[in-house]
């Protein structure tokens, strides 16, 4: 398995995390922005991330669309729930997280002053409402993770998005949203591989 993306977390991080949590070894190829114009014509659809999977016969399957890739990997490794009800809750959480990500994306590729202004607007606007909705979903769980105590794609996309919010304001979550803090603690305790990956992850701009 080879994952190709820029040298950042961004849209590829949930894919990296689900691969790590599933125990799948993969090549993490990172492209610098200055090299992208040369490489872009060789990428299907001209967008990243993509994943290349080589089967036992040596045939290579190229996959695009970050969430579709993450869902494919999660389903393959039984991380999309054991019942229809669990599947619904996982998809509900993914949708709630995507709402948070839509707000975060407003801050990307902006000059520092404008980014700071937009960050304050979203952190004082929609984000608290969206995070509270996520907390309500976590409260409904029968365990410590999104569905019970089993790691799923919902858990991975949630902590990846929370890291983006923390990037905008390191103190934003302090003393608030206890369910989100509890969720992260239990996720890392449940998945030592993921905890190790996060502890060793290099800091990047996004």
Swiss-Prot record:
Domain of life, source organism: Eukaryota
Protein's name according to its UniProt entry: Glutathione S-transferase class-mu 28 kDa isozyme
InterPro entries: Glutathione-S-Trfase_C-like, Glutathione-S-Trfase_C_sf, Glutathione_S-Trfase, Glutathione_S-Trfase_N, GST_C, GST_superfamily, Thioredoxin-like_sf
Summary of subunit composition and partner proteins: Homodimer.
Binding positions (glutathione): 5-6, 11, 36-40, 48, 50-51, 65-66
Record-annotated GST C-terminal domain positions: 83-206
Function of the protein: Conjugation of reduced glutathione to a wide number of exogenous and endogenous hydrophobic electrophiles. GST isoenzymes appear to play a central role in the parasite detoxification system. Other functions are also suspected including a role in increasing the solubility of haematin in the parasite gut.
Catalytic activity annotation: RX + glutathione = an S-substituted glutathione + a halide anion + H(+)
Entry EC no(s): 2.5.1.18
Root EC class: transferase
Residue ranges occupied by any GST N-terminal domain in the UniProt entry: 1-81
Further facts: There are at least two isoenzymes of GST in S.japonicum.
Higher taxonomy: Eukaryota, Metazoa, Spiralia, Lophotrochozoa, Platyhelminthes
Keywords tagged on the record: Transferase
A molecular function GO annotation: glutathione transferase activity
A single GO BP: glutathione metabolic process
One protein family per Pfam: GST_C
Protein family according to the UniProt entry: Belongs to the GST superfamily. Mu family.
Protein source organism: Schistosoma japonicum (Blood fluke)
